[in-house]
Curated annotation (Swiss-Prot):
Binding residues annotated for 2',3'-cGAMP, in chain numbering: R133, I134, S137, Y149, R157, Y282, S321, Q377, P381, T384, K393, C396, F400
Mutation effect (K328A): Reduces IRF3 phosphorylation upon cGAMP stimulation
CDD domains: MFS (cd06174)
Tissues in which the protein is found: Placenta, liver, and to a much smaller extent, in lung.
UniProt domain comment: Has separate binding pockets for folates and cyclic dinucleotides. Two cyclic dinucleotides can be accommodated in the binding pocket and they are likely transported at the same time.
Cytoplasmic side: 1-29, 88-91, 140-153, 203-266, 328-333, 385-398, 456-591
Effect of R133A: Reduces methotrexate uptake. Reduces IRF3 phosphorylation upon cGAMP stimulation
Name assigned to this protein: Reduced folate transporter
């Protein structure tokens, strides 16, 4: 037995205890994803419109189109901001519970209600469930550290998409194969939703959130006390000012950052896409089931394939969203053209939906909707990345909230003018004709923007920015560099980036009688007298790295190895007193 000693004990590292968050985050994320999956199991949702228009409820198509469905847009606009704020203030889980109870209320009204007012109240509760989706998508980030955000975001999104797909397939199988009535299908949906409410009761309530429940008080007090010690003042005015500033720092700082962020062209472009294209997308989604019923007004529930169309569109949307992550283009140049192409495709698909009339062509309507939804889902992750790539997490949430709010305003205005009975009250087919024109106008605007960007790019290519005293093109630069290498065989042509500087003997050999011939053959060299050219061509013993080169800070050697302009200007040669700038090409330093 080896006796223990203090020296030996000190050498043994003390293992840190396991982090409770590291031990439990997998279980919490798995439970939340299971809840997200079960909350989407609503097999009767794809068949709500034929249920309302069928013998069970016996509403007219005009009532559903112009009186019931428009309430969804109005109520969603009314509850969006309060639910968004309550989600963060109450720390997610109460809002998730509210969402589950609202879903239960929707299906209770759907089963027990018989008047237009009951159905309008149903739309109000459904708008609450839509606004509360932010609670699920943001709640998962409070469970893990930032390093795991990307992974858990993929898990939560996959759970939701899998739940929607499973729900649509299950509903279609029950209707087509099991010959289940729409009323029975809604009772099955109510049972699943009740189970999801029970699951929501056991969700862990996090201790922090993005805006209202942040641990900023300690940091503010620490900053104030440190600054008071550094710069004391009468009555602690500085500390008081900082404490006051900390009270409203979150809102004020985020508003300032939001104003600064709006100067970025990509952020403006994709935010505008989010506002206007999302508004048109959800209008199509809200009314497409009514259009399908008008194309094929069958009373045989087994011939209604709404669930299959929703399942296929969800699957295609998941595939296109996944594929969008592998698109590698220069977004600053091609974003508008990509958006214009996708929007023009959507305009054509909506036009096809509006002009399909024969019941045998219902499958064409299904296919057009599947492609329409897949094309929109293709751009959603691209827009998300382009908006969020340069923003903080808090500011990103604010930008998405603002974009969604303005999209809801646009959607509500269009709904009131086009669909509402107090507005034009158009039938569903004419509405889709207007929606196709809406997407067509958007695509034309995007195309014009892409053309203007292309013209600006071509103008910059034909007229590069150069100083007025400089008239040398890249071909003349290469010719002058080659003329220098001809005079000295030791150079052996243009030097690579790693070559050592020229010795004084080698560089002096480039100045002499041959220099006169070079000046006569090269019009640019002929502009400078021989003594001045000799002064310009005088060697330097250390490399002259490019001005403003990022590698210059680490030394001339690093700059020479990394600067791309040294392929034209060898190290150690100050060619004609010119230095290369990354942004402006070649600049005369002797002006």
């Amino acid at each position: 037995m080896v006796p223990s000693s203090p020296a030996v004990e000190k050498q043994v590292p003390v293992e840190p205890g396991p982090d409770p968050e590291l031990r439990s985050w997998r279980h919490l994320v798995c439970y939340l994803c299971f809840y997200g999956f079960m909350a989407q199991i609503r097999p009767g949702e794809s068949f709500i419109t034929p249920y309302l228009l069928g013998p069970d409820k016996n509403f007219t198509r005009e009532q559903v189109t112009n009186e019931i469905t428009p309430v969804l847009s109005y109520s969603y606009l009314a509850v969006l901001v309060p639910v968004f704020l309550l989600t963060d203030y109450l720390r997610y889980t109460p809002v998730l519970l509210l969402q589950g109870l609202s879903f239960v209320s929707v299906w209770l009204l759907l089963l027990l209600g018989h008047s237009v007012a009951h159905m309008q109240l149903m739309e109000l509760f459904y708008s609450v469930t839509m606004a509360a989706r932010i609670a699920y998508s943001s709640y998962i980030f409070s469970l893990v550290r930032p390093a795991r955000y990307q992974r858990v975001a993929g898990y939560s999104r996959a759970a939701v998409l899998l739940g929607v797909f499973t729900s649509s397939v299950l509903g279609q199988l029950l209707v087509t194969v099991g010959r289940v009535s729409f009323s029975t299908l809604n009772y099955i949906s109510l049972a699943f939703l009740t189970f999801s409410v029970v699951l929501a009761l056991f969700l862990k309530r996090p201790k922090r959130s993005l805006f209202f429940n942040r641990d900023d008080r300690g940091r503010c007090e620490t900053s104030a006390s440190e600054l008071e010690r550094m710069n004391p003042g009468p009555g602690g005015k500085l500390g008081h000012a900082l404490r006051v500033a900390c009270g409203d720092s979150v809102l004020a700082r985020m508003l300032r950052e939001l104003g600064d962020s709006l100067r970025r062209p990509q952020l403006r472009l994709w935010s505008l896409w989010w506002v206007f294209n999302s508004a048109g997308y959800y209008l199509v989604v809200y009314y497409v089931h009514i259009l399908w019923n008008e194309v094929d007004p069958t009373t045989n529930s087994a011939r209604v394939y709404n669930g299959a169309a929703d399942a296929a569109s969800t699957l295609l949307g998941a595939i296109t969203s996944f594929a969008a992550g592998f698109v590698k283009i220069r977004w600053a140049r091609w974003s508008k053209l990509l958006i214009a192409g996708v929007t023009a495709t959507q305009a054509g698909l909506v036009f096809l939906l509006a002009h399909t009339r024969h019941p045998s062509s219902i499958w064409l309507c299904y296919a057009a909707f599947v492609l329409f939804r897949g094309s929109y889902q293709f751009l959603v992750p691209i827009a998300t990345f382009q908006i969020a790539s340069s923003l903080s997490k808090e500011l990103c949430a604010l930008v998405f909230g603002v974009n969604t709010f303005f999209a809801t305003i646009v959607k509500t205005i269009i709904t009131f003018i086009v669909s509402d009975v107090r507005g034009l009250g158009l039938p569903v087919r004419k509405q889709f004709q207007l929606y196709s024109v809406y997407f067509l106008i958007l695509s034309i605007i995007y195309f014009l923007g892409a053309m203007l960007d292309g013209l600006r790019h071509c103008q910059r290519g034909h007229h590069p920015r150069q100083p007025p005293a400089q008239g040398l093109r890249s071909a003349a630069e290469e010719k002058a560099a080659q003329a220098l290498s001809v005079q000295d065989k030791g150079l052996g042509g243009l030097q690579p980036a790693q070559s050592p500087p020229l010795s004084p003997e080698d560089s002096l050999g480039a100045v002499g009688p041959a220099s006169l011939e070079q000046r006569q053959s090269d019009p640019y060299l002929a502009q400078a007298p021989a003594p001045q050219a000799a002064e310009f061509l005088s060697p330097v013993t250390t490399p002259s790295p490019c001005t403003l080169c990022s590698a210059q800070a680490s030394g001339p050697e690093a700059a020479d190895e990394t600067c791309p302009q040294l392929a034209v200007h060898p190290p150690g040669v100050s060619k004609l007193g010119l230095q290369c700038l990354p942004s402006d090409g070649v600049q005369n330093v002797n002006q």
